[in-house]
């Protein structure tokens, strides 16, 4: 009996535990949330460890309203009621790691649009739309390419999982972005203007590297080629328009890098752009007056190269200004847009050039006749400058697509094999050729001798015609000869360090006798 009475007395004397819902809080700065309190006997008292929030307690003790201040961190709210019952509420105040856009529309062009290209564009589009705070890490799940190309006038849907890791500083965010891809039917276009940007080649400070204006009447191509100096920085390509009219642009682009292997970057860019341009694969974006569109925003480490080619067509509104920027880590590209152009390095590999019709060539070869040859990338002819008084030049035809109408004729009574070859004249060079929709490339070659690109087997009495497209690879030395011959050329590029390779290894001297 005494034990029972003692238990009752102890139960009455021991304070109870309050029930809270939710049992912990995660708040953004200035965010407010109501917390329900069960089992409290008024009055309810509240104290805080750090005062990262403010607390308003209801008179009946059934709830508290917690409001975060602008400070971030962790706090604990201690509640005690009139009977001594207690509860602790852990609180964390932080910003969300970023913002995931739930749905969007991506307008593309392509005749048709290749599945792998589409998947890459969707990934890039979602990456660009996903905004993360400094120090947070964005992870875009791999996008599965569609089972078939996307024809003009059709659409496709993609659901892309996105994760933003707050790295302990922010609240992690996870979700999906639904992308409706629409393939807009547009006629292909060829720019008549080339913006050539390779001066200064090495990035040593922040600022504007190149600035050019594109109008609806004259599409333009931007070719940029830069490597980083000593400090990590970004290469940014921004498109802006001050027009009050809605401005829409079509962008057909490819890029390569960052990579320290400059010749690999140059050839990768050529191959990617030739294929992309042939399929008319691009994106259509709308520009706003108050926000630049970042076509490229590429982090670079010391000595890494980034290069790109983009054809720009203004579909409505405009004009559009294309600006290439060197931006140190942490700097806002928008603060540099209106600055002066950085001093050049003295090579004058920059400027605006007329390329309408430039690079249109023909090769005609008849079996049994002399070789047919064409020199590309020489100092004469070279794309003429828009401003004849400007010091810039484009020796090497960088950024120019050479389109070669090839005609082969075999009038004889026996089959015949003709060889397409590439012959460097100025030093190490690589080359890529788009022939009948397929890419053929030549590895790094240096010695001025013909190297085989491909061969053509001609039946007796037959004629063959096709169109070949090629571009000067960045980091390659031009001019070079493109030719057709009956004599089998060297079948492939030698090893890089071979005596006839691009960068021969010094030969050891023979031991003295």
Q: What do the predicted segments below correspond to?
A:
Residues 15-21, 99-102:
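Proline-enriched interdomain boundary motifs that mark the N-terminal boundary
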Residues 25-30, 107-118, 396:
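Short, solvent-exposed loop/linker segments at the N-terminal edge
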Residues 37, 72-84, 156-166, 310:
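A short beta-strand micro-motif common to beta-rich folds, especially ectodomain repeats
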Residues 39-42, 49-51:
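Short glycine/proline-centered coil/turn motifs in the loop regions
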Residues 62-74, 143-152:
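Extracellular/luminal low-complexity segments enriched in Ser/Thr/Pro
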Residues 81-88, 167-175:
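Short, exposed coil/turn segments at beta-strand boundaries within extracellular/luminal domains
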Residues 90-97, 176-184:
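Short beta-strand edge segments in extracellular beta-sheet folds
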Residues 111-112, 128, 132, 145-151, ...:
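Long compositionally biased, domain-poor regions of proteins
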């Amino acid at each position: 009996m005494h034990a029972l009475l003692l238990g009752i007395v102890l139960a009455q004397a021991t304070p109870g535990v309050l029930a809270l819902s939710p049992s912990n809080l995660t708040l953004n700065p200035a965010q407010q949330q109501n917390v329900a309190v069960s089992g409290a006997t008024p009055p309810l008292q509240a104290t805080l460890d750090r005062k990262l929030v403010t607390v308003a307690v209801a008179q009946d003790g059934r709830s508290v309203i917690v409001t975060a201040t602008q400070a971030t961190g962790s706090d604990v709210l201690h509640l005690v009621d009139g009977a001594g019952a207690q509860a602790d509420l852990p609180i964390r105040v932080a910003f969300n790691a970023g913002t995931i856009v739930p749905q969007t529309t991506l307008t593309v062009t392509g005749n048709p649009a290749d599945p792998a290209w589409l998947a890459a564009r969707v990934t890039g589009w979602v990456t660009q739309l996903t905004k993360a705070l400094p120090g947070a890490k964005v992870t875009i799940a791999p996008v599965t390419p569609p089972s078939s190309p996307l024809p003009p006038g059709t659409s496709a849907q993609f659901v892309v999982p996105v994760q933003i890791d707050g790295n302990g500083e922010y609240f992690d965010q996870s979700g999906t972005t639904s992308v409706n891809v629409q393939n807009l039917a547009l006629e292909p276009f060829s720019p008549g203007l080339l913006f050539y940007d390779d001066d200064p080649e090495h990035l040593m400070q922040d600022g504007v590297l190149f600035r050019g204006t594109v109008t609806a009447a004259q599409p333009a191509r931007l070719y940029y080629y830069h490597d980083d100096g000593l400090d990590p920085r970004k290469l940014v390509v921004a498109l802006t328009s001050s027009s009050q009219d809605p401005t829409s642009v079509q962008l057909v682009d490819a890029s390569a890098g960052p990579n320290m292997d400059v010749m690999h970057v140059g050839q990768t860019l050529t191959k990617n752009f030739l294929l992309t341009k042939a399929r008319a694969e691009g994106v259509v974006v709308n520009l706003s007056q108050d926000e630049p569109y970042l076509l490229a925003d590429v982090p670079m480490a010391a000595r890494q190269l980034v290069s790109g080619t983009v054809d720009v067509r203004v579909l409505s509104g405009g004009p559009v200004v294309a600006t290439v920027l060197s931006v140190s880590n942490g700097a806002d590209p928008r603060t540099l847009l209106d600055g002066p152009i950085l001093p050049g390095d003295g090579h004058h590999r920059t400027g605006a050039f007329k390329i309408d019709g430039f690079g249109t060539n023909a090769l005609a070869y008849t079996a049994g006749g002399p070789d047919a040859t064409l020199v590309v990338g020489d100092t004469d002819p070279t794309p003429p400058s828009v401003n004849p008084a400007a010091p810039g030049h484009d020796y090497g035809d960088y950024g120019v697509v050479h389109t070669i109408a090839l005609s082969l004729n075999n009038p004889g009574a026996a089959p015949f094999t003709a060889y397409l070859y590439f012959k460097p004249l100025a030093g190490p060079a690589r080359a890529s050729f788009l022939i009948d929709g397929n890419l053929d490339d030549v590895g790094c070659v240096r010695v001025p001798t013909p190297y085989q690109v491909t061969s053509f087997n001609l039946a007796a009495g037959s004629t063959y015609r096709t169109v070949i497209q090629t571009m000067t690879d960045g980091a390659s030395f031009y001019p070079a000869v493109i030719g057709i011959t009956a004599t089998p050329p060297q079948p492939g590029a030698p090893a890089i360090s071979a005596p006839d390779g691009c960068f021969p290894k010094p030969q050891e001297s023979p031991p003295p006798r």
